[in-house]
Amino acid sequence: MNERQLIARVIAGDRLAGRTLYDTHAPRVYSLAYRLSGDAEKAREVTQDTFIRAFSRLAQFRGDAAFSTWLHRIVVTVVSNARRSEVRIAREVALDEAHSIEMTAPEAEPDLKESIARAVDNLSEAYRTTLILHDIEGYTHAEIASMLGVPEGTCKSRLSAARAQLREQLAAFKE
């Protein structure tokens, strides 16, 4: 059974087909969610939220792109919404609690792997997402443009800028 037939069966209410569709795509959805969020628990939540959204909107899937591309666009949206929510909550620290926030001195330079992870985390959301989708997940610029709803040229320039920022932040490791 091909993926279109599987999707049609899920829309018709076939729970086994839904489980098959989930089992087929969940590992890559989780992988992308983990790379974008950097946290296993958040990645599990994002994976769950992604499939809840996908199954509730499955009838809206037109098939213009691959089903996995459509799912990954949902992952990006869910992670982005979660990050915005976290930032909003972080800003809402009460003034009387603000005095208890301590500043710590940066530790000695960790190894390269930790520095790379930190440098990627420091990228803007748009740059980080584009970098992960292209360099780690292996999507083409056209697929990323479709997922993010931006022109292909924007994806290319974001990737170039992300790589330039990483080179700058990791220059200390260059010999």
Task: Give residue spans per PLM region.
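Sigma70-family region 2
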Residues: 11-12, 38, 49-66, 85-87
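Arg/Lys-rich amphipathic alpha helix in sigma70-family domain 2
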Residues: 56-63, 73-93, 109, 161, ...
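Amphipathic, Lys/Arg- and hydrophobic-enriched alpha-helical face
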Residues: 22-40, 57, 120, 169-172
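Structural recognition of an alpha-helix C-terminal capping motif at a helix-to-coil junction
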Residues: 31, 45-52, 65-77
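Helix-turn-helix DNA-binding module
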Residues: 1, 118-121, 125-129, 133-154, ...
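DNA-recognition helix of helix-turn-helix
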Residues: 76, 80, 136, 148-172
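Acidic, proline/glycine-rich intrinsically disordered inter-domain spacer in sigma factors
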Residues: 90, 97-121
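A short, charge-rich alpha-helical start-of-domain segment used by transcription regulators
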Residues: 7-31
